[in-house]
Amino acid sequence: MMIDIPEDKLVAGVDEVGRGPLVGDVVTAAVILDPANPITGLADSKKLSEKKRLALFDEIKQKALAWAIGRASPEEIDELNILHATMLAMQRAVAGLSITPELVFIDGNRCPSLPMEARAVVKGDSLVAAISAASILAKVTRDAEMTELDSRHPEYGFARHKGYPTPEHLAILAERGPLPAYRKSFKPVRHALGIE
């Protein structure tokens, strides 16, 4: 069940992917959908098959009025903490839009500081079509980055666990130690570095 969107306002949806992983950027996306060019099948990216996500990824980029990716690096995550780095990445995604929205719906329970009206929507990736679209862009983008990292470091298994702290990943991290792309403020990485 999608929530009603004001028809007289230019609305963007924003979502993030990658708060939990031990490695890589936190990736966000902002999307302004075109009401005259609807996209069927939008849903929370985590509930879609990879094949469906990839098809929707291309369709969203073609049909949206505007879209942008924002990110915060592992260094920024370590410096700011993951919550503040996520807010920064969301600000960057909104600032990257080629059209300025009048209203921004953010997935979750808090909004970054933005120069326009913003509303937090819990479970927004299932309730607001533009947030669903943003979740798909962010997830496909981040998954592709993990696959690329996997091609450079296949022994770490990034294509399988996408950087999340699975038992397999934690065992590899303990054995091989962290790469530069790891988030050094995250406890399992600190442990692998011998900091705690």
Swiss-Prot record:
Catalytic activity: Endonucleolytic cleavage to 5'-phosphomonoester
Metal-binding among keywords: yes
Domain RNase H type-2: 9-196
Named cofactor requirement(s): Mn(2+); Mg(2+)
InterPro entries with a match to the protein in the record: RNase_HII (IPR022898), RNase_HII/HIII (IPR001352), RNase_HII/HIII_dom (IPR024567), RNaseH-like_sf (IPR012337), RNaseH_sf (IPR036397)
UniProt cofactor note: Manganese or magnesium. Binds 1 divalent metal ion per monomer in the absence of substrate. May bind a second metal ion after substrate binding.
Function: Endonuclease that specifically degrades the RNA of RNA-DNA hybrids.
Family designation: Belongs to the RNase HII family.
Name listed for the protein in its UniProt record: Ribonuclease HII
Species whose genome carries this gene: Aeromonas salmonicida (strain A449)
Gene that encodes the chain: rnhB
